[in-house]
Regions:
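Conserved functional hotspots at enzyme active or ligand-binding sites that engage polyanionic ligands
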Residues: 1-122
Length: 122
């Protein structure tokens, strides 16, 4: 019997995310933002969504990742995108397809800044 996959904060995963109507879903990349203790103990993960709709000037709640940058390569991302910290999901681990990469500590610091703005914690 295989052991359950352990996910860490900063992992970039492909997940089957539901649309707002919850009837339909789409496989898309997400970034794990939940702490590692909860990641290990819970059946769910807190993630933020990536969007390929990149505005010319990202919002304060968005962190831009350019295709072909070292971060995009490390994260397994092939298109320009933004981490949209205004789109936060709690998803079951069963919705995860696979890990495609991870963010650096520096990039996660920027994501944390965006999350604080999104959640009015700053």
């Amino acid at each position: 019997m295989s052991s359950p996959q352990l996910y860490q904060r900063g992992d970039v995963l492909l997940a089957d995310l539901p649309f707002a109507d919850v009837v339909r879903s789409k496989v898309r990349p997400v970034l794990v933002v939940q702490n590692d203790v909860a990641n290990r103990l819970r059946d769910n993960l807190i993630v933020v969504a990536f969007s390929s709709r990149v505005p010319s000037l990202p919002l304060p709640t968005q962190y831009r990742v350019k295709a072909n940058s070292p971060l995009a390569q490390r994260a397994g991302l092939v298109r320009d995108c933004v981490v949209d910290c205004s789109v936060i999901h709690t998803i079951a681990k069963s919705r995860i397809r696979r890990k495609i990469g991870s963010f650096t500590g520096e990039a996660m610091d920027e994501v944390d800044r965006c999350l604080k703005i999104s959640l009015a914690l700053a």
